[in-house]
Amino acid sequence: MKVLILNAGSSSQKSCLYEIPDDALLTEAPQPLWEGKVNWTQDRSVAEIEVKTAGGETLHESIYGDSRQAHVTYMLYTLSRGTTKVIGQLSEIDVVGHRVVHGGQNYRNSVIITEEVKQAIAKLSNLAPAHNPAALEGIEAIEKSLGDVPQVAVFDTGFHATLPDAAAIYPGPFEWVEQGIRRYGFHGISHQYCSARAAQILGRDLASLRIITCHLGNGCSLAAIKNGRSIDTTMGFTPLDGLMMGSRSGSIDPGIIVHLMRQSDYSAERLDYVLNKASGLRGISGVSSDLPQVIEAITQGNYRAQLAWDMYVHRLRSGIGSMLASLGGLDVLVFTAGVGEKSPGIRQAACEAFGFLGLKLDPEKNQNNPVDIDIATADSTVRVLVIHTQEDWAIAQQCWHLLNR
């Protein structure tokens, strides 16, 4: 079975092609046959296309035109044309899987995409304006290029559908619940993959483990996982809630928003920009939303950069503590995504606060670019894993299961 994956972002569209045996799902992620990416520059009419194959062929090209859908279609053509050709024709693809950030209340599981599903994704775009419209662009590009090939939507909110009401419902008027205003949670594909991978690495039954997964990238969230299910998470109604992030504020006193609207004449659009694009590491440090650049500024004595680091660590520790309370104990702590996988300093700072649990980090393992390994000491009562999140493979697995039911 040939499975094509599209993972849409606000400024990029990533894609890869897997070949999976029809009769048995592989236990570990295989190398994709082909990987493609469209990056949009500040000029919307210019797209940077990057393609590489398992055989080592690469393509870097700039293309012009106002249609993002056309740019994605061009990227897909490189699957069956030119030096990056890995299949004879696009019709060889059996199924296409899409990461869809927001599925709302109605989509708890992966589904075959229909017109009804597309309309629901579009309707939820106001809750994920940077991502749901981009997912629709990818879906429509596939319809144009591959016709009626089955397409599957895998929702980032789906894994958190098991949150108990006490964790999911906000303490506002009950009318909010009736309006669908609740904690949905995000990064669910990553949290679910990493919890299952942690159990696999440790040789343990997932249902027996109490796990906290820390997805720390430009966007950051934690999940508390018990019996293989999400029972608490830090992101909420939107991906703006929870931890301090690269350019997002995370949780703040809602009274600040009321104050700014009254005293400073902030519009909804300006608030949206400030909280999503000009806060977090970027807003506090004044340097960057990228943690390595903030760390570099710290070495040069930049006070605001140091403050940004300290706040990031404080809020991460507080979030882990909150998840710990929901679980009633902890067996495994997982770090994943760009910061989680690549920043030994953040892992060390986070773990230092939980020595009272008997958690002990192995300094050498932590510093040695760990991937899919346990970096706790042998006598630590909590296992600490660094896992390379593979959302694309997790989506491919969902596609395989749907088509083999």
Swiss-Prot record:
The record marks H187, R248 as: Transition state stabilizer. The keyword Kinase applies. Mg(2+) binds at N7, E391. Pathway: Metabolic intermediate biosynthesis; acetyl-CoA biosynthesis; acetyl-CoA from acetate: step 1/2. Its EC number is 2.7.2.1. GO terms for biological process: acetate metabolic process; acetyl-CoA biosynthetic process. Substrate binds at R99. It holds the Pfam family Acetate_kinase. The active site is at D156. Its cofactor is Mg(2+); Mn(2+). InterPro entries: Ac/propionate_kinase, Aliphatic_acid_kin_short-chain, Aliphatic_acid_kinase_CS, ATPase_NBD. Disulfide bonds: none annotated. Keywords: ATP-binding, Cytoplasm, Kinase, Magnesium, Metal-binding, Nucleotide-binding, Transferase. It is found in: Cytoplasm. It catalyses: acetate + ATP = acetyl phosphate + ADP. PANTHER family: ACETATE KINASE, ACETATE KINASE-RELATED. Catalyzes the formation of acetyl phosphate from acetate and ATP. Can also catalyze the reverse reaction. Homodimer. HAMAP family: Acetate_kinase. This is Acetate kinase. The gene is ackA.
